[in-house]
């Protein structure tokens, strides 16, 4: 995880990283059960000294592999590996567009030059690159230039504007994210930049029907999860715990202890029982809200809680879309 730095002594009571063999064994078991597409992520997956061995082994199992990376560690060894066994996709997180931005947010000014060089190298090899960018108060001023970088290099760019509260943080730790009004406006702006004014106008033209629904559904139970999590998607963390999604802390199964199939069956069963906030069922903004079990859990500590911050984000998103449609 990006925000965790522990000594081996601090990590011992919590869990341990799984070995090369363990990862390859669980990968083999997952392939037998039908796994075809795999994402390797972290933190930074290339920090593991055995990354190349794990990646090669999984690739040779026939998996289509994507990678999430900050783009700093694609040195000669990794380049040689990718030349022979290119990933299906690599998502690079771009934190800014200058040495100053990387110095301020990441503490490593020179990382910016490394990241740009590696992005250009990946493109030169015909490897599909997507740009991600996590926007915080520290790099908000870089957002326009990140879009411009993506346009110049003909790269898809997806900004992460909603920041999950890090539920595993210390209670004393500060949590820095944009206010709901700013996030809502930025999501609308991203929709405009990515899809054009016609899409905005089409979305707004449908608001009338949705808003005719009376708020408050009167139900005691909310809707079930509607995403792929726990249906055709799972996540295994650094210590070997399986969840339905990387942003969920529960339910948890232990595939390295009970076997992959048993763990998957457990996740499917428990995920199917999750219900969301009843107030969301007939909310007038349901069609544009990105509410999910991970959001409600992180924001409220329960799956059926009402995430007021996300409600405010969506209201501001809605209002900004209307303004953009009139321009």
Which functions belong to the PLM regions below?
Residues 1-89, 190, 324:
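Conserved alpha-helical substructure of the radical SAM core
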Residues 2-5, 105, 255, 295:
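Residue-level signal for well-ordered alpha-helical positions
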Residues 8-17, 104-110, 174, 298-299:
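Short glycine-enriched, charge-decorated loop/helix-capping segments at active-site entrances
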Residues 18, 49, 110, 138-141, ...:
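Residue-level signal for the nucleotide or nucleotide-sugar donor/cofactor binding architecture
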Residues 45, 73, 135-137, 250:
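Short histidine/acidic/glycine/proline-rich micro-motifs that form metal-
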Residues 83, 88, 93-229, 235-243, ...:
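Radical SAM enzyme [4Fe-4S]-AdoMet core and its adjacent flexible, acidic
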Residues 217, 221-224, 246-327:
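Flexible mid-to-C-terminal extensions adjoining Fe-S/redox cofactors in radical SAM and related proteins
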């Amino acid at each position: 995880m990006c925000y965790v730095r522990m000594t081996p002594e601090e990590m011992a009571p919590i869990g341990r990283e799984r070995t090369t063999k363990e990862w390859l064994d669980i990968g083999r078991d997952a392939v037998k059960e039908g796994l075809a597409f795999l994402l390797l992520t972290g933190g930074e997956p290339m920090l593991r000294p055995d990354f190349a061995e794990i990646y090669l082994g999984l690739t040779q199992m026939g998996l289509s592999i994507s990678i999430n990376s900050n783009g700093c560690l694609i040195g000669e060894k990794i380049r040689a590996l990718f030349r022979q066994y290119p990933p299906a996709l690599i998502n690079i997180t771009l934190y800014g567009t200058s040495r100053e931005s990387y110095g301020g947010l990441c503490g490593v000014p020179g990382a910016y030059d490394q990241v740009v060089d590696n992005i250009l190298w990946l493109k030169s090899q015909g490897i599909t690159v997507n740009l991600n960018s996590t926007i915080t108060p520290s790099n908000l001023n870089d957002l326009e230039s990140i879009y411009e970088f993506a346009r110049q290099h003909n790269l898809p760019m997806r900004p992460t504007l909603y920041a999950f509260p890090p539920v595993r943080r210390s209670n004393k730790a500060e949590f820095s994210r944009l206010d709901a009004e700013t996030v809502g406006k930025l999501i609308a702006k991203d929709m405009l930049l990515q899809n054009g004014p016609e899409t905005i106008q089409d979305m707004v033209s449908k608001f009338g029907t949705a808003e005719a629904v009376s708020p408050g559904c009167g139900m005691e139970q909310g809707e079930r999860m509607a995403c792929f999590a726990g249906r055709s998607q799972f996540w295994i963390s650094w210590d070997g715990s399986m969840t339905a999604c990387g942003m969920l802390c529960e339910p948890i199964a232990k595939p390295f202890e009970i076997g992959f199939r048993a763990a998957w069956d457990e996740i499917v069963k428990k995920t199917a029982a999750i219900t969301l906030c009843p107030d969301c069922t007939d909310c007038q903004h349901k069609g544009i809200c990105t509410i999910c079990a991970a959001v409600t859990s992180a924001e409220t500590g329960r799956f059926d809680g009402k995430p007021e911050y996300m409600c405010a984000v969506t209201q501001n998103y809605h209002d900004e879309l209307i303004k953009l449609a009139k321009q």
